[in-house]
């Protein structure tokens, strides 16, 4: 399936099937945040115009008219789901983002990449060594973005490298906290070089990436080893290359939200979630409490927590670019009463350690 190409189709020549979509967005008057308005959905021609505007906004291109027709049909189906969800007036809303021309199965195959089948966690040892075990009180809210410990949102693209982005975000955070320097680091080095247990664009695990950084003597800066959205040959480190080091890593006790907040109050964390839900694909804003399982398939970073209108949440940094969610972030509801947390966020959190 070709989702982009250098050539652009100049005209939408097929006689597209007119579909009657009775759509409205009842829960918000600011339609700009979801990417469509009722006027866009009043006629077949306006629906096509909406699709063309979306193509331009996200710089999409299709190799054939047939492919464009197929993507339009998927787009309409996704739009129907988005609008039906928004009409329910939930605490979050969905929008027409970069993934609006992908079926849900295509999306999961292309953008999720955590490999939990290679997990090795010693739960008793994890709790015994947990650095923040004896912390008694934490602030009501923490946002590491405001403390300058979170780099700009990045985009993994269609490479299943979420594990590398999750790892890097946590290392960038602790490095800023300890040294005062926010240094943007290389996910590509992990993809190309951390191959003992991790599998590049075919998934991996954050704990193994932390181990690689320790054994390798650090991780290079992004500018010295830029992201290419594909697996490459590991580039040997040059003597003049600057690296950021860590001393080790620790796991947060499993299914323990209090412990997760204790750690998160002190530094950004690598966390794993179940991001396979269709509502997660199109999340655009608000405190998310939608349907999702606990089968971990996506690595992200927890960078804070807080409350809004009585809803407690965890601030999660994703790696799907700044046009997804709230400028690349999602607020996941916490205090759900389930030990594993919403989308399994309490199941497998970890963090790097650094003393100097």
From Swiss-Prot:
<keyword id="KW-0378">Hydrolase</keyword>
<keyword id="KW-0788">Thiol protease</keyword>
<feature type="active site">
    <location>
        <position position="298"/>
    </location>
</feature>
<keyword id="KW-0325">Glycoprotein</keyword>
<keyword id="KW-1015">Disulfide bond</keyword>
<dbReference type="InterPro" id="IPR025661">
    <property type="entry name" value="Pept_asp_AS"/>
</dbReference>
<dbReference type="InterPro" id="IPR000668">
    <property type="entry name" value="Peptidase_C1A_C"/>
</dbReference>
<feature type="active site">
    <location>
        <position position="162"/>
    </location>
</feature>
<protein>
    <recommendedName>
        <fullName>Cysteine protease XCP2</fullName>
        <ecNumber>3.4.22.-</ecNumber>
    </recommendedName>
</protein>
<keyword id="KW-0611">Plant defense</keyword>
<comment type="subunit">
    <text>Interacts with PRN2.</text>
</comment>
<dbReference type="GO" id="GO:0042742">
    <property type="term" value="P:defense response to bacterium"/>
</dbReference>
<feature type="disulfide bond">
    <location>
        <begin position="193"/>
        <end position="234"/>
    </location>
</feature>
<dbReference type="GO" id="GO:0006508">
    <property type="term" value="P:proteolysis"/>
</dbReference>
<dbReference type="InterPro" id="IPR039417">
    <property type="entry name" value="Peptidase_C1A_papain-like"/>
</dbReference>
<dbReference type="GO" id="GO:0005773">
    <property type="term" value="C:vacuole"/>
</dbReference>
<feature type="active site">
    <location>
        <position position="318"/>
    </location>
</feature>
<dbReference type="InterPro" id="IPR038765">
    <property type="entry name" value="Papain-like_cys_pep_sf"/>
</dbReference>
<feature type="signal peptide">
    <location>
        <begin position="1"/>
        <end position="26"/>
    </location>
</feature>
<dbReference type="InterPro" id="IPR013201">
    <property type="entry name" value="Prot_inhib_I29"/>
</dbReference>
<dbReference type="InterPro" id="IPR025660">
    <property type="entry name" value="Pept_his_AS"/>
</dbReference>
<keyword id="KW-0645">Protease</keyword>
<keyword id="KW-0865">Zymogen</keyword>
<keyword id="KW-0926">Vacuole</keyword>
<dbReference type="InterPro" id="IPR000169">
    <property type="entry name" value="Pept_cys_AS"/>
</dbReference>
<keyword id="KW-0732">Signal</keyword>
<comment type="similarity">
    <text>Belongs to the peptidase C1 family.</text>
</comment>
<feature type="disulfide bond">
    <location>
        <begin position="292"/>
        <end position="343"/>
    </location>
</feature>
<dbReference type="GO" id="GO:0010623">
    <property type="term" value="P:programmed cell death involved in cell development"/>
</dbReference>
<dbReference type="Pfam" id="PF00112">
    <property type="entry name" value="Peptidase_C1"/>
</dbReference>
<feature type="propeptide" description="Activation peptide">
    <location>
        <begin position="27"/>
        <end position="137"/>
    </location>
</feature>
<keyword id="KW-0472">Membrane</keyword>
<dbReference type="GO" id="GO:0008234">
    <property type="term" value="F:cysteine-type peptidase activity"/>
</dbReference>
<dbReference type="Pfam" id="PF08246">
    <property type="entry name" value="Inhibitor_I29"/>
</dbReference>
<feature type="disulfide bond">
    <location>
        <begin position="159"/>
        <end position="201"/>
    </location>
</feature>
<comment type="function">
    <text>Cysteine protease involved in xylem tracheary element (TE) autolysis during xylogenesis in roots. Participates in micro autolysis within the intact central vacuole before mega autolysis is initiated by tonoplast implosion. Involved in susceptibility to the bacterial plant pathogen Ralstonia solanacearum.</text>
</comment>
<keyword id="KW-1003">Cell membrane</keyword>
<dbReference type="GO" id="GO:0005886">
    <property type="term" value="C:plasma membrane"/>
</dbReference>
<dbReference type="InterPro" id="IPR013128">
    <property type="entry name" value="Peptidase_C1A"/>
</dbReference>
<feature type="glycosylation site" description="N-linked (GlcNAc...) asparagine">
    <location>
        <position position="181"/>
    </location>
</feature>
